[in-house]
Swiss-Prot record:
It comes from Arabidopsis thaliana (Mouse-ear cress). Residues 392-417 are annotated as: Amphipathic helix 4 (AH4). PEX5 stability in light-grown seedlings depends on PEX7. A motif (WxxxF/Y motif 5) lies at residues 362-366. This is Peroxisome biogenesis protein 5. The gene is PEX5.
């Protein structure tokens, strides 16, 4: 039905002697609630629908007066001695006959007792069959929209509405109110709808403000008697039609209705309403997609946590684990049956504006093209829009139901990271598993370089120390290898070689060198502490605890507090307790605080670890490796900005500190600043091209920064091209 028909009505007159009518508000009522015949059938189905009886008296004497219709408007203006209260007390002060006489006097329009000025009635009273009462009631609701005044309904009799009728009125009145009061605020619209629903006793738990049968039994009796008197001159339906026609003539006829409606709800108003509906629909769909992505994030978060327990550094930096980690952090999402990079808030907002809000404005186009014939087409457009919405939602559900895990893994294999097929991912995963198993078998075995120009050098140890001091770590490692090949029992040579590999971001070689140093000198405290730190970096807690306990057991100051029998059953809590005792014995020992920081990193108590390292830095402020440990702990504690500051302190003390350069890049990447992280990885690799972990980090940042054009250079390890493209 077009809106013009709802507003203008047809040319035919009401059918005499019946309740059917072609008047616009009658049609509007039928459009909202269905025809009167259907309503009468529903009323007949309700058992005892018209039965009313006395209800329990649960109001006090004063509450009965305040609960009369309209009393909520009068209450702020009436004082305890006001004439309104005296009027009601007059009713209660007489006997039954006196009450009847007073009521007859009111009905006959006799002179009223002197009263102060009251509010003029805004809405008429309603009487007649339920369908006619409801039609008049909704008519008054529509009238309030034209006048722009708050809807203050008069009491209505019990209509016997079914639950489906109430639901229909609740839903449609809310929709129509937003059309009628489009130029008013949301608070006004809600108050209008609430007043309508409350008067019809629709909302559960809301006490109706209208007349409630049973509160005033005497007045109910007179009400029922007055309703039994039917005026003989006009049929009720004809009377209604006559009143409406007279009202239409008084207000200028149908044309003035259309003009008034267009003024209040013109083209722009409907375009705005439609735009809001579309925005809400899109938000709902986005929330549905977000829920699915949240579920995927939760599953991958559990998987990532399980995989992260593995200690192999190459597996920790594998592309498979990186993929799972990015899914768990929400950096990858499922969209249109594909795995895609999650857009930043600014990006999707810009995309939305370009697609839906860009010039020419779709709202203006909608207003010019779709509503060029006035408001009579709005009903058809609204029905069509609803059908399209439901179709779109069904299609989305059907598409998502077809999604399976294998599909999105295959899509990702060709997506953000840049591999050409899913087989590449499977092969890469198998490769890292093999390396993981091989790493366990060869753990502790030092691998010498194939080509070493320092073999045969007269003083390789001295040369290695000088190169290490200059920060040329790769060259220093070669010189120190030549030294330990010449003197295999040189514990200091092995120790310095292990330190060089650790600073060069190669913990596996560092551990192997330190183990050879321990074989040569089992009680060397620096070696034991370095082994504990390296195994902590490899997430090997049990082994790390063994070496840290060995450091305490062999220390001349603290050996007495470390019982020998504890070595058979090492627990983190016991070791931490012993080192806390040591810190109390000697608070000025920076090494004790360093070990405590390492222990708290093992238990992931990062705040306590940060405190321990900061205490140690107060004692050794120029220890660049200690600044690096603090930065790594802050990064693990999701304090990447603070970590960058700590790494910078380490680099200021030692500019060629490869591990600090790589860690700086990791901190930027953890903040989503992938473009900024790339130059730091390139700088670290320029100083140590053999740092496999740094190559993996660089490749990931290139992919996340959408620099697929440089991935080939990363794969071929073309440092010249990378340094030229990403200078620092």
């Amino acid at each position: 039905m077009a809106m013009r028909d709802l507003v203008n009505g047809g040319a035919a007159c009401a059918v005499p002697g019946s309740s059917s009518s072609s008047n616009p508000l009658g049609a509007l009522t039928n459009a909202l609630l269905g025809s009167s015949s259907k309503t009468q059938e529903r009323l007949k189905e309700i058992p005892n629908a018209n039965r009313s009886g006395p209800r329990p008296q649960f109001y006090s004497e004063d509450q009965q007066i305040r609960s009369l219709p309209g009393s909520e408007l009068d209450q702020p203006l009436l004082q305890p001695g006001a004439q309104g209260s005296e009027f009601f007390r007059g009713f209660r002060s007489v006997d039954q006959n006196g009450l009847g006489a007073a009521w007859d006097e009111v009905q006959q329009g006799g002179p009223m007792p002197p009263m102060g000025p009251m509010f003029e009635p805004v809405q008429p009273t309603f009487e007649g069959p339920p369908q006619r009462v409801l039609s008049n009631f909704l008519h008054s609701f529509v009238e309030s929209s034209r006048g722009g005044i708050p809807f203050r309904p008069a009491p209505v009799p019990v209509l016997g509405l079914s639950q489906s009728d109430k639901q229909c009125i609740r839903d449609r009145s809310s929709i129509m109110a937003r059309h009628f009061f489009a130029d008013r605020g949301e608070e006004f619209i809600n108050s209008q709808v609430n007043a309508l629903l409350s008067s019809l006793d629709i909302d559960d738990g809301i006490q109706a403000r209208g007349h409630v049968p049973g509160r005033f039994r005497e007045l109910d009796d007179y009400w029922n008697e007055s309703q039994a008197v039917v005026k003989p001159n006009l049929h009720p339906a004809d009377n209604w039609a006559a009143e409406f026609n007279q009202h239409g003539m008084d207000h200028g006829g149908p044309d003035s209705w259309v003009q008034s409606f267009e003024q209040q709800h013109g083209v722009n108003g409907w375009a705005t309403e439609f735009e809001q509906g579309q925005s809400q629909l899109m938000s709902s769909q986005m929330r549905s997609m977000d829920m699915q992505n949240i579920a995927a994030m939760e599953q991958t978060r559990k998987l990532a946590h399980t995989l992260s327990q593995d200690g192999n550094p190459k597996f920790q930096n594998s592309r498979f684990l990186q993929f799972v980690s990015k899914m768990s952090r929400g950096e990858l999402i499922i969209d249109e049956n594909q795995v895609k990079q999650a857009s930043a808030p600014g990006e999707w907002a810009t995309e939305y504006e370009q697609q839906y809000l860009g010039p020419p404005s779709w709202a203006d186009q909608f207003a010019n093209e779709k509503l060029s014939h006035g408001p009579e087409q709005w009903a058809d457009e609204f029905a069509s829009g609803r059908g399209q919405q439901e179709t779109a939602e069904d299609q989305w559900v059907n598409e998502f139901s077809k999604l399976n895990v294998d599909d999105w893994i295959d899509e990702f294999a060709e997506g953000p990271v840049g591999d050409s097929s899913a087989d590449a991912w499977a092969n890469a995963y198998d490769e890292f598993l093999n390396e993981k198993n091989a790493g366990k078998q060869t753990s502790g075995v030092y691998v010498f370089s194939d080509m070493n120009p320092y073999v045969g050098h007269p003083e390789p140890m001295k040369e290695g120390q000088e190169l290490f001091r200059k920060g040329l770590l790769s060259e220093a490692a070669l010189a120190l290898e030549a030294e330990v090949m010449k003197n295999p029992e040189n514990a200091e040579g092995w120790r310095l070689l292990g330190v060089t590999h650790a600073e060069n971001d190669d913990d596996q070689q560092a551990i192997a060198a330190m183990m050879r140093a321990q074989e040569a000198d089992p009680t060397n405290l620096e070696v034991l502490l370095a082994l504990g730190v390296s195994h902590t970096n490899e997430l090997e807690q049990a082994t790390a605890l063994k070496y840290l306990y060995g450091w305490l057991r062999n220390h001349p100051k603290y050996g007495a507090i470390a019982p020998p029998e504890l070595a058979d059953s090492l627990y983190h809590a016991d070791i931490a307790r012993l080192f806390n005792e040591a810190s109390q014995l000697n608070p000025e020992d920076a090494d004790v605080h360093i070990v405590l920081g390492v222990l708290y990193n093992l238990s992931r108590e990062f705040d306590r670890a940060i405190t321990s390292f900061q205490t140690a830095l107060q004692l050794k402020p120029n220890d660049y490796s200690l600044w690096n440990k603090l930065g790594a702990t802050q990064a693990n504690s999701v304090q990447s900005a603070d970590a960058i500051s700590a790494y910078q302190q380490a680099l200021d003390l030692k500019p060629n500190y490869v591990r600090a350069w790589a860690n700086m890049g990791i901190s930027y990447a953890n903040q989503g600043m992938y473009k900024e992280s790339i130059p730091y990885y390139v700088r670290a690799l320029a100083m140590n091209p053999k740092a496999d972990n740094a190559w993996q980090y660089l490749r990931l940042s290139l992919s996340c920064a959408s620099r697929q054009d440089m991935i080939e250079a990363c794969e071929s390890r073309n440092l010249d091209l990378l340094q030229k493209e990403f200078p620092l």
